[in-house]
Design a protein with these regions (language model features):
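Conserved N-terminal entry element of GNAT/NAT acetyltransferase domains
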Residues: 1-14, 169-173
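Acetyl-CoA-dependent GNAT
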Residues: 7-11, 21-31, 37-100, 111-113, ...
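Conserved hydrophobic beta-strand within the GNAT/NAT acetyltransferase core sheet
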Residues: 92-95, 126-130
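Glycine-rich phosphate-binding loop
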Residues: 101, 105
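Conserved catalytic-core motifs of GNAT/GCN5-like acyltransferases
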Residues: 127-131, 141-162
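Terminal substrate-recognition subdomain of acyl/acetyltransferases
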Residues: 158-173
Length: 173
């Protein structure tokens, strides 16, 4: 099965929204409340992504992974670090991959695309917030980031951990 990655475009919103919902429901089962996950809809996520794409600027880097029949099976979203609090240039905002495609190095391909975009735009470091109980945090940890913070999100009752790669040129895939 051939999977390739490319820059995301507005026409990808429906596919990105579907991956976002489906991957949340599998990734966060048992971490977020069932009721919370059950109430996430494709329509909500599509609207969220429409808003994100409307705010498009040159400091945002978005890529999708798709099958040979152009079905989107994953995405990554990143850009300039949003808080300014962690002395990091860039931030990985989100990366999601449908469960059946995990473990096939597709996430690494997406991550490499984001890293290349950041490096090409003179960024040296990258921040990511990860739900602490998310087993997928191992994906980030294998690239040896520095753990720099934690915070508790009251609204959804979960803890997040912030990781930073201080020199993204040294991340080895």
């Amino acid at each position: 099965m051939e999977i390739h990655s490319r820059r995301a475009i507005k026409d990808d919103i429906r596919g990105i929204g579907k991956v976002h919902v489906d991957s949340w429901k599998t990734t966060y089962k048992g971490i977020f409340a069932d009721e919370f996950l059950e109430n996430i809809t494709y329509e909500q996520r599509e609207k969220q992504w429409e808003n994100i794409f409307q705010q498009e600027d040159k400091s945002k880097y978005r890529f999708v992974a798709e099958t040979s029949d152009e079905t989107i099976i994953g995405f990554i979203d990143g850009g300039v670090e949003r808080s300014g609090a962690y002395n990091c240039d860039g931030e990985l905002y989100a990366i999601y991959l449908l469960q059946e495609y995990q473990g096939m190095k597709i996430g690494q391909k997406l991550f490499q695309s984001l890293l290349s975009a950041c490096i090409n735009n003179d960024m040296q470091s990258l921040l990511v917030w990860v739900v602490t109980n998310n087993p997928s945090k191992n994906f980030y940890e294998k690239f040896n980031p520095e753990k720099i913070d934690t915070k508790f999100l009251e609204r959804v009752q979960v803890e997040e951990t912030a990781y930073c790669w201080r020199d993204i040129n040294n991340i080895i895939m």
